[in-house]
């Protein structure tokens, strides 16, 4: 801040107002300051300030008889200048990009060149003096001395104001300084009212004389509301054009607007391609264009330097005035490196060069690439073609009109204190009274007020409304007339360079007469330098007037006036500023400004009118604002039915703040959509792109299969593939009429979604909306594929993460995010989605499997075996270079450190050594993750070529909120550092902007609390108990110790959260039975066939229709006794037949209950008689092959509940996936129901019938008669007296129970115990290696052998009855007849000749693997122990 300004501000205490234009620099020099915004007024001519006078403005007397200045100021300088509006279109730093100051010492003739009709008077700082009589009225040309004759020092301080706040440095380089004057509201309303009254009386005569000498012209609104416009530019003639010409002096009129030149010294013309440099942003491709307000493309700024108006090539439309020194001719994108080299040469120090050479951030680089693509395309065009193709079109919108002028003219003088809102009243009909009539019919006070707002009179034609850059010129003819504000008001926020649209809440705007018509819209297209704006009215010209009460009660519903929108008035002041004696009162407020907005062509040009809805942008529209040539700013999503565009909010509010009026008017800044955008993260992350879409996401969630971009304007194939395409991606120019079918559906050659090989032998997924095709062999490779009777459900309908937990029901339920390129799907949310995946839409992503890794980003494997030891690395940090970075998890974040380390050799120093593990040897390294293994630990040979571990083969991925070990760099001296994988939306914005690719995810380092992007090759999971991999280290860095403690604590927190979540999930699922599909009849699966008998083959019973209960339980029905159900067309009883329970499904009411120890059960609600039909056991009818396949799959997925019931050899009912209530009936050794096979219409079906009378409320059970296919037995919890203890074991009969009772009683007598001879059951050592431990025992009778699973090369115990390899020939696998008694080698009769020889150990046979003289070592027998078991431990001999 300049000291001269702060000094004057503190001494004078006056409010400093905004300048008439944006000023180049904040370093404003106030030496020799004078009023540099006034106009020279000729005798008898109109004063320029008469164009727009504010409320409370006091007319000064004329200058005919006033003495000249005595304080050294030039006599031509006036204390009052015209009211200047803040330009609605933001320019670069303070109106220019040259970074120079705006106010310097120069002559008035160099500074003033044109007149600004609508300007705003600046305050006049008065030097405090002793109380004296008030001075005489001042004049526009001079500073009036006081009555005492002593001159009064009047200083004019020019101050840069932007976004309603004072600006004292470049908006591209720093935040705005918010310095509000402390003395703004020092005077009370009463004092202000009294002063205004005195001034009014004192200068009444002066004002009357001035009105007689200066006639009030009726100016054309187009001329009035255009700042920076030269007076000599011929405007459209107003009604009183002769008066205006007489009033305008002939000599040049001074103005504060920079001189606009279009001929002399102009290097670039409209349509030329240039590079421009703004602030810290890189050289950006631009096109020279015409300013929509000045209608010129080149001007001389206040320092005499030339500036060019350029529009930037990017995804968002931006424009600015740029200094000529920062503009270069564009010759191609290769020129960028030359510009960097040139800037580097001019750099003063090394740090500046580093900044210049620093890589651009991710978002900025993406936007820059978009701009380069446009520029390269435009480079091939001629200048005229570029102007036609890329020039912005500005859609102008009429704001809400103020109340009628007549109503304002009759207001009393006391209303001077009323808060004033500058506004313009539009009317389709001209005013009936001219200026003279107004002057003669109204009081002087009313005339003064009207002269302030005469540019808003009803006599005026429509002034230029807000210009919004809607499309480029190439699409002006196709601009739809329906793109209008529908019952809404448009509020455009001002930013440092380019306004951004903010669509306010939709309000119904009504005029004073209540016609209820809405705002019409105008379209402006800038045709070139000096050309007038072409206006094409969309719709009818309607007058929209809102009463003052409506605006005062609902300020948020009021549209900004043309005075604020068409001119260059600044944004609303953040705080009300109380003016000096000659300014408005403290109760007056500034009008809300609606700056302009530009929307570039690419956002809407390809979108048809039918799809003009708020949606997701294609391409780089998802990229943050920080990559554009702008600073970050608040943005709110649009609700208007306009072109598809979404904006991302990077902060809750603008860093420069909003004025009170803006916040009150546009509360959509903090709307839900904007809040959702604020939480969004990087475009290349899953959750980030989900959050950015917000309310603009299409429910259909369509993605083009060619370009992989989401959008609403897609063509859907109506064939079997269910895919969507962009019209451009299909090579079409228009949307095809009628039904569209893609080429694959037309030819029938669909590619397999797994192997991508086309052919007709592929099968479609059974899900109707899926549309994916697979080879059957390909889809069977995925454990998440579900095969059904009618086909299969592909893996994209099952969560890959949940399937790893062997919970197939959980994995197949819920909303999925499906990969666009491969058969992978995850549940929506961070819990299941693999870290590093990229979201395309809310339900479509590209998984991390498609990460393209280079040789430089290969996996960094650990130096230990994951099986036998969770490795230990010992290192002494003798190398000072490495020791300084060994415990720094983030050293690669430093560019200098990275460059320093990369100069060193990749071979680790000799100080790093691997601790000898127990087994030693070579390590087998995974190509996808850091895992390493000893081949011996995996029982495999060292493979050739690439190899992936089992987890990577199975598709196991890392997830967010997972604790991991991370290593940055390829050096062993750099430790593996504990970190947590973070969701991209939870990391800071600068971390989101770091360079990363598909498959990368951010991690948070414990201890140092840094972030970085890594991939799976540098990360492996943290396991409870992990400490560090440098236990041999004598000293551990404090940061690393802290990291270990934080990681352990965080791991326990996440573990507790996970366990709590699982407990809640288990509790929730325990309230209802596991999911299944309820069916009423059996469903045939596979090759099973259902037999249907002919009516002639159905037996006929001998029951009569007149019987009491024909075919009932107590009847002598032959069909019932033979378990054959009667047919209604064959049975003599007809409809009264009671032997049709299967067909009619006559089940007693029952309910599913939760039992104490047996899971879910079935309980009857009413009493059931003995023999009564209870239920039919229904499910899927499968054959034996399918049954064994399902059992095998169930074992692999750790499923222990089975619902299979065998009807015949090739007919098995599986009620697991589908069934009825009978599937919940539990087993009991003493059941109350039994299963019976009945023939129903020729087909065999299974029914459950009551074995006894069952009272209401009792659980229904039956005996499973389980056939044990495995060697394990399931414990029975039925609680019956005759319970066998295990399922599949026959329950004890009555005779057996009696014998057991007798034996139990006999034990009470004294007996003499006799030791029974024991016999060996199974050996307690492995027959292969001789060690003990967990052993698998052979099920062959009298075989005592047992084995380790690893010795058998098995990972799980074998299922069913298992025989050890000792009983099979080693050569052919047939039954062995000769055995080696020291190892599992055995031979059949054909291969046993000469294979075995007697040994020296008791003549036992041994194979060639043993020495016959000493087949085993002496220590071998010391390890062998046998398990002995008595034949009858309870047998005792009676004394």
From Swiss-Prot:
Residues 401-413, 425-445, 546-568, 637-648 have a biased composition (Polar residues). Residues 1272-1288 form the Post-SET domain. GO terms for biological process: methylation; negative regulation of DNA-templated transcription; positive regulation of DNA-templated transcription. Its EC number is 2.1.1.370, 2.1.1.371. CDD domains: PHD2_NSD3, PHD4_NSD3, PHD5_NSD3, PWWP_NSD3_rpt1, PWWP_NSD3_rpt2, SET_NSD3. It is found in: Nucleus; Chromosome. GO terms for molecular function: histone H3K27 dimethyltransferase activity; histone H3K27 methyltransferase activity; histone H3K4 dimethyltransferase activity; histone H3K4 methyltransferase activity; zinc ion binding. Residues 270-333, 960-1025 form the PWWP domain. InterPro entries: AWS_dom, C5HCH, NSD_PHD, PHD2_NSD3, PHD4_NSD3, PHD5_NSD3, PHDvar_NSD, Post-SET_dom. Residues 670-691 have a biased composition (Low complexity). Residues 1096-1146 form the AWS domain. Residues 202-244, 583-595 have a biased composition (Basic and acidic residues). Residues 1036-1065 form a coiled coil. A motif (KIKL) lies at residues 154-157. Residues 187-201 have a biased composition (Basic residues). It comes from the Eukaryota. The modification Phosphoserine is found at residues 150, 457, 585, 587, 590, 655. Residues 1148-1265 form the SET domain. One of its GO terms (cellular component) is nucleus. There is a cross-link at residues 218, 245, 413, 502, 532, 628, 1154 (Glycyl lysine isopeptide (Lys-Gly) (interchain with G-Cter in SUMO2)). The modification N6-acetyllysine is found at residue 790. This is Histone-lysine N-methyltransferase NSD3. The gene is Nsd3.
């Amino acid at each position: 801040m300049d000291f001269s300004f702060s000094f004057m501000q503190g001494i004078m205490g006056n409010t400093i107002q905004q300048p008439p234009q944006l000023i180049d620099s904040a370093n404003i020099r106030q030496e020799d300051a004078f009023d540099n915004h006034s106009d020279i007024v000729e005798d008898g001519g109109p004063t320029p300030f008469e164009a727009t006078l504010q409320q409370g403005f006091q007319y000064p007397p004329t200058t005919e008889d006033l003495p000249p200045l005595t304080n050294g100021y030039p006599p031509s300088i006036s204390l009052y200048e015209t009211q200047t509006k803040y330009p609605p279109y933001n320019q670069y730093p303070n109106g220019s990009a040259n970074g120079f100051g705006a106010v310097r010492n120069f002559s008035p003739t160099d500074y003033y060149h044109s007149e600004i009709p609508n300007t705003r008077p600046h305050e006049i700082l008065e030097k405090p003096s002793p109380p004296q009589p008030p001075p005489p009225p001042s004049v526009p040309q001079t500073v009036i001395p006081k009555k005492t004759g002593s001159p009064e020092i009047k200083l004019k301080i020019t101050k840069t104001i932007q976004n309603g706040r004072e600006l004292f440095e470049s908006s591209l380089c720093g935040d705005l300084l918010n310095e509000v004057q402390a003395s703004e509201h020092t005077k009370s309303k009463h004092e202000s009212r009294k002063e205004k009254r005195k001034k009014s009386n004192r200068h009444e005569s002066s004002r009357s004389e001035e009105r007689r000498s200066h006639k009030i012209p009726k100016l054309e609104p187009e001329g009035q509301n255009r700042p920076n416009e030269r007076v000599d530019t011929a405007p459209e003639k107003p009604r009183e054009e002769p008066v205006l010409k007489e009033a305008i002096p002939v000599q040049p009129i001074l103005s504060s607007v920079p001189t606009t030149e279009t001929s002399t010294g102009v290097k670039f013309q409209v349509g030329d391609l240039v590079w421009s440099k703004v602030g810290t942003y890189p050289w950006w491709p631009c096109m020279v264009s015409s300013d929509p307000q000045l209608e010129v493309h080149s001007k001389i700024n206040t320092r005499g330097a030339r500036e060019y108006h350029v529009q930037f090539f990017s995804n968002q439309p931006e424009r600015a005035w740029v200094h000529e020194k920062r503009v270069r001719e564009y010759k191609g994108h290769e020129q960028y490196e030359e510009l960097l080299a040139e800037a580097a040469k001019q750099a003063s120090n090394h740090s500046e060069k580093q900044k210049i050479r620093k890589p651009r951030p991710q978002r900025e680089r993406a936007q820059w690439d978009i701009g380069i693509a446009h520029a390269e395309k435009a480079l091939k065009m001629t200048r005229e073609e570029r102007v036609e193709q890329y020039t912005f079109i500005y859609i102008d919108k009429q704001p809400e009109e103020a109340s009628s002028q007549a109503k304002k003219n009759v207001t009393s003088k006391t209303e001077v204190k009323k808060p004033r809102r500058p506004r313009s009243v539009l009317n389709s009909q001209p005013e009936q009274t001219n200026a003279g009539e107004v002057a003669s019919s109204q009081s002087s006070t009313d005339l003064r007020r009207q002269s302030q707002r005469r540019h808003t009179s009803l006599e005026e034609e429509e002034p230029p409304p807000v210009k919004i850059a809607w499309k480029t010129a190439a699409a002006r003819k196709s601009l739809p007339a329906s793109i209008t504000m529908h019952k809404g008001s448009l509020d455009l926020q001002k930013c440092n360079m380019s306004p951004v649209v903010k669509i306010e809440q939709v309000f119904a705007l009504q005029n004073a007469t209540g016609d209820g018509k809405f705002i019409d819209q105008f379209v402006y297209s800038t045709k070139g330098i000096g050309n007038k704006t072409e206006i094409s009215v969309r719709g009818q010209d309607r007058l929209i007037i809102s009463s003052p009460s409506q605006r005062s009660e609902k300020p948020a519903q009021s549209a900004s006036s043309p005075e604020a929108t068409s001119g260059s008035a600044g944004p609303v002041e953040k705080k009300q500023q109380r003016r000096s004696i000659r300014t408005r009162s403290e109760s007056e407020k500034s009008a809300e400004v609606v700056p302009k907005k530009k929307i570039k062509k690419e956002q809407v040009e390809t979108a048809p009118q039918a799809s003009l809805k708020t949606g997701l942008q294609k391409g780089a529209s998802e990229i943050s604002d920080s990559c554009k040539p702008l600073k970050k700013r608040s943005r709110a999503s649009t609700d208007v039915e306009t072109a598809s565009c979404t904006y991302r909010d990077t902060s809750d509010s603008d860093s420069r703040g909003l004025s009170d009026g803006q916040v009150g008017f546009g509360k959509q800044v903090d709307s839900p959509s904007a809040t959702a955008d604020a939480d969004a993260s990087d475009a290349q992350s899953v959750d980030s792109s989900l959050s950015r879409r917000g309310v603009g996401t299409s429910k259909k969630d369509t993605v083009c299969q060619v370009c992989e971009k989401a959008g609403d304007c897609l063509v859907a194939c109506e064939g079997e593939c269910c895919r969507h395409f962009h019209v451009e991606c299909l090579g079409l120019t228009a949307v095809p009429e009628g039904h569209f079918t893609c080429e694959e559906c037309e030819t029938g050659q669909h590619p397999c979604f797994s192997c991508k090989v086309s052919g007709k032998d592929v099968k479609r997924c059974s899900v109707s909306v899926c549309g994916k095709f697979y080879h059957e062999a390909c889809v069977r490779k995925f454990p998440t594929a579900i095969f059904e009777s009618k086909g299969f459900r592909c893996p994209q309908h099952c969560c890959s993460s949940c399937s790893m937990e062997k919970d197939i029901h959980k994995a197949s339920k819920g909303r999925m995010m499906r990969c666009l390129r491969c058969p992978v799907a995850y549940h929506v949310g961070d819990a299941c989605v693999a870290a590093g995946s990229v979201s395309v839409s809310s339900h479509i992503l590209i998984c991390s499997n498609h990460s393209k890794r280079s040789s430089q980003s290969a996996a960094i494997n650990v130096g230990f075996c994951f099986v036998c030891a969770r490795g230990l690395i010992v290192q002494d940090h003798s190398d000072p270079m490495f020791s300084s970075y060994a415990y720094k998890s983030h050293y690669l974040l430093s560019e200098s450190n990275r460059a320093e380390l990369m100069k060193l050799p990749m071979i680790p120093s000799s100080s790093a050594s691997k601790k000898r593990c127990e087994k030693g040897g070579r390590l087998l390294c995974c190509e996808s993750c850091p895992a390493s293994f000893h081949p011996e630990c995996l029982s495999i040979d060292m493979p050739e070529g690439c190899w992936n571990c089992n987890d990577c083969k199975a598709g196991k991925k890392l997830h967010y909120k997972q604790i991991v070990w991370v290593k940055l760099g390829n050096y062993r001296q750099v430790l593996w550092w504990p970190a947590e994988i973070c969701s991209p939306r939870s990391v800071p914005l600068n971390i989101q902007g770091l360079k990363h690719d598909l498959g990368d995810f951010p991690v948070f380092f414990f201890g140092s609390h840094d972030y970085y992007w890594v991939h799976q090759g540098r990360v492996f999971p943290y396991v409870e108990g992990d400490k560090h991999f440098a236990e041999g280290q004598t000293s551990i860095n404090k940061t690393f110790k802290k990291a270990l403690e934080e990681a352990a604590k965080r791991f326990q927190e996440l573990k507790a959260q996970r366990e709590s979540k699982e407990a809640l999930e288990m509790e929730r699922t325990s309230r209802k039975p596991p999911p299944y599909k309820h069916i009423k009849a059996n469903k045939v699966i596979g090759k099973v066939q259902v037999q249907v008998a002919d009516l002639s083959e159905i037996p006929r019973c001998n029951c009569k229709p007149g019987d009491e209960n024909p075919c009932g339980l107590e009847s002598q029905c032959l069909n019932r006794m033979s378990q054959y159900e009667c047919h209604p067309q064959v049975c003599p009883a007809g409809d009264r037949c009671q032997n049709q329970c299967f067909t009619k499904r006559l089940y007693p009411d029952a309910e599913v209950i939760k039992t104490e120890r047996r899971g879910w059960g079935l309980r009857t609600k009413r009493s059931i008689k003995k023999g009564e039909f209870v239920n039919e056991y229904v499910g899927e009818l499968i054959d034996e092959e399918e049954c064994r396949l399902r059992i095998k799959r169930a074992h692999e997925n750790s499923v222990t509940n089975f619902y299979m019931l065998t009807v015949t050899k090739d007919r098995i009912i599986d009620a697991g996936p589908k069934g009825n209530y009978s599937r919940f009936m539990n087993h009991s050794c003493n059941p109350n129901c039994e299963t019976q096979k009945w023939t129903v219409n020729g087909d065999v079906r299974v029914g459950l019938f009551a074995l006894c009378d069952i009272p209401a409320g009792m659980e229904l059970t039956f005996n499973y008669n389980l056939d044990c296919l495995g060697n394990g037995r399931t414990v029975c919890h039925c609680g019956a007296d005759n319970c066998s203890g295990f399922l599949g074991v026959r329950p004890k009969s009555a005779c057996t129970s009696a014998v057991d009772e007798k034996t139990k009683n006999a034990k009470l007598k004294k007996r003499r115990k006799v030791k029974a001879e024991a016999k060996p059951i199974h050996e307690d050592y492995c027959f292969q290696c001789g060690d003990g431990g967990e052993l698998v025992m052979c099920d062959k009778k009298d075989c005592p052998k047992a084995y380790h699973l690893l010795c058998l090369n098995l990972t799980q115990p074998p299922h069913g009855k298992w025989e050890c390899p000792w009983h099979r020939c080693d050569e052919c696998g047939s039954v062995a007849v000769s055995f080696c008694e020291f190892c599992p080698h055995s031979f059949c009769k054909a291969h046993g000749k000469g294979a075995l020889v007697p040994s020296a150990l008791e003549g036992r046979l041994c194979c060639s693997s043993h020495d016959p003289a000493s087949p085993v070592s002496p220590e071998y027998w010391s390890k062998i122990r046998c398990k002995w078991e008595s034949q009858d431990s309870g047998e005792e001999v009676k004394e």
